[in-house]
Each structure stands twice: as C-alpha cells, then as structure tokens.
C-alpha cells in the first residue's frame, strides 16, 4: 500500500491506512512465524549441533534483512531530494535491486532447517512467494514512478540474483 501511495497510484489521504496495513502485516508475519516455530519445536525430540548452526544462519540472515531494510539506505540521499527520489546503488543495493528478498528467503529457509515441520515449510513458501510478488510489483510498477533514475539502475544492477560484477561492486562500494 505504501509503495502504491508513493507512486501516486493511491491518494496521499490514505497515508494513515497504509501505516496501519504495514503494522498489521508485520504483526501477522511475526505471530504466524512464531506459532509455526512453536508447533515445529514441540515435535523435536533432541537438539543437534547442526540445528545450532542453522539457527545461527537464521540469525545472520535476519540481521542482514534488518540492516538492508532499515540501515543500508542513507535517508537524506535516497528520499529527501529536490528533484525526485534517486536510487541508491552502493553497498547492499549494488548486489541486486531487492537484496531483502535474498535475506528474507534465507532466514525462512534456515528457520525451517532448524525446526522442520510442514506448517513452517508451508508458511515459509507462502511468505517467500508473496515477498517475491511484492518486489515484482515494486520493480515493474511502483519504483519506476518513485525513483527518477530507476530504469538506469535496472540496467546496471541485477534483479535478484547477484552476478560476479555486482558482488565486486557491492564489496568495492562498502570499502569506500
């Protein structure tokens, strides 16, 4: 909803509602994941070293997701400009156009590998599919309207799967 509002597809008067939908969506994701993990954990008979490794990987992907969504973009440079919003093509956003999808998927994959369970697997698959559909909408509809240079960014940076060149650019821009 927020992206549709920013792309001027929805009226700005709906801003309060878009914030509400974000909070509701976040809470649904959090609660459904917690319930699925709790159910899967109930059937565990013992804990292994491998599960500990998978849990650490879950935490790593979760931290990458949080960093990418909330800290990787410089707010002023990305959102507060005189001549429209510009894309940011350094760090994580040199890797691919939607790096959060990689970390979100990795987080759910390793969470499922840690605890197992059909419910958690189904939830992970649904959430990852919905996340993918969301970034397809962003990439094709909303971001080209929000970011004045998005089509140029699309030519330089891969959609989801990093390339050798984009990995090198990510590392290079992080060093600077």
Question: Which positions does each model-derived feature cover?
Answer:
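Membrane-anchoring alpha-helices and their flanking helix-loop junctions
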Residues: 1-89, 103-176
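Glycine-rich acyl-CoA binding loop
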Residues: 91-94, 98-101
């Amino acid at each position: 909803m927020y992206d549709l509002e920013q792309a001027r597809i929805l009226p700005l008067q709906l801003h309060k509602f878009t914030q509400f939908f974000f909070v509701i969506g976040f809470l649904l994701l959090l609660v459904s994941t917690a319930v699925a993990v709790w159910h899967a954990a109930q059937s565990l008979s013992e804990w292994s070293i491998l599960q500990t490794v998978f849990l650490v990987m879950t935490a790593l992907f979760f931290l990458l997701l949080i960093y990418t969504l909330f800290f990787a973009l410089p707010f002023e440079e990305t959102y507060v400009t005189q001549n429209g919003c510009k894309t940011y093509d350094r760090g994580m956003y040199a890797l691919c156009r939607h790096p959060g999808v990689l970390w979100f998927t990795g987080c759910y994959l390793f969470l499922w590998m840690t605890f197992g369970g059909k419910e958690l697997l189904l939830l992970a698959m649904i959430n990852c599919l919905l996340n993918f559909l969301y970034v397809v909408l962003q990439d094709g509809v909303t971001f080209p309207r929000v970011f004045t240079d998005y089509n140029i960014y699309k030519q330089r940076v891969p959609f989801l799967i990093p390339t050798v060149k984009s990995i090198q650019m990510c590392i290079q821009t992080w060093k600077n």
